[in-house]
From Swiss-Prot:
GO biological process: AMP salvage
Family: Belongs to the adenylate kinase family.
Entry keyword Flavoprotein: no
One annotated Gene Ontology cellular component of this protein: cytoplasm
Pathway linked to the protein: Purine metabolism; AMP biosynthesis via salvage pathway; AMP from ADP: step 1/1
Pfam families according to UniProt: ADK
Catalytic activity: AMP + ATP = 2 ADP
Protein name: Adenylate kinase
Taxonomic source organism: Dehalococcoides mccartyi (strain CBDB1)
Binding site for AMP: 32, 37, 58-60, 86-89, 93, 160, 171
Annotated segments matching region NMP: 31-60
Length: 216
């Protein structure tokens, strides 16, 4: 099984790229954000806890994140590989993932870091709208946002509570203080490929696929 990690700050496009690249390379796509949102929708104690952290722009504690993600990964048996989007987000999570994969006779094949400047991240996130049905993202000013409908499924659009300018800045502060060290962690292992996230979306996709194939 070939496992790939996507690193990048909120708004870097790693979610969009993860879906596209997973489809192109026939890999499973696991987005931590989606797992958390499903937990919130369940309305149980775990979901309420996750919701409280996300609304404050804080990272969900390691012990909760690790438990949720590893449980999901254990159920993905009939796949050729996995793209992990949004996990790990701390060195502790990375070490827990390494340990779990070793126990399964697996490892990390390549780590993709999508690099986008901070001011651009704030602009992207503050203007992001999301479909309530399929979670497709849109930017303020586009036709879909003007109409208030998703072009994929016709679902209604909304702005997430954690996409306000104030919360966005806090999320980025948390990211760069707690998650950025992962870049050096994986670089030291010779697994990291840094991709310029300011390029056209299609070009970013090409560069990511090339990096993954070269890393095999």
């Amino acid at each position: 099984m070939y496992n790939v990690i996507f690193l990048g700050a909120p708004g870097s496009g790693k979610g969009t790229q993860g879906e596209v690249v997973a489809k192109e390379l026939k890999l499973a796509h696991m987005a931590t954000g989606d797992l958390f949102r499903k937990a919130i929708e369940c309305g149980d104690e775990l979901g309420d806890t996750v919701k409280s952290y996300m609304e404050r722009g804080e990272l969900v504690p390691d012990e909760i994140t690790i438990s949720v993600v590893l449980k999901h990964l254990a159920g993905l048996t009939d796949v050729t590989g996995i793209i992990l989007d949004g996990f790990p987000r701390s060195l502790r999570q990375a070490e827990a993932l390494d340990e779990a994969l070793v126990q399964q006779g697996q490892g990390i094949g390549r780590v993709i870091y999508i690099n986008v400047p901070g001011d651009e991240l704030v602009r992207r996130l503050s203007g992001r709208w999301v479909c309530r049905s399929c979670q497709s993202p849109y930017q303020s000013g586009c036709a879909e946002v003007t109409k208030g409908k998703c072009s994929r499924c016709q679902g209604g659009l909304y702005q997430r509570p954690d996409d306000t300018p104030e919360t966005v800045k806090e999320r980025l502060k948390v990211y760069f203080s707690k998650t950025a060290p992962l870049i050096e962690y994986y670089r030291s292992k010779g697994k990291l490929s840094e991709i310029d996230g300011m390029a056209e979306i299609s070009e970013v996709t090409k560069r990511i696929i090339s990096a993954i194939k070269c890393g095999k």
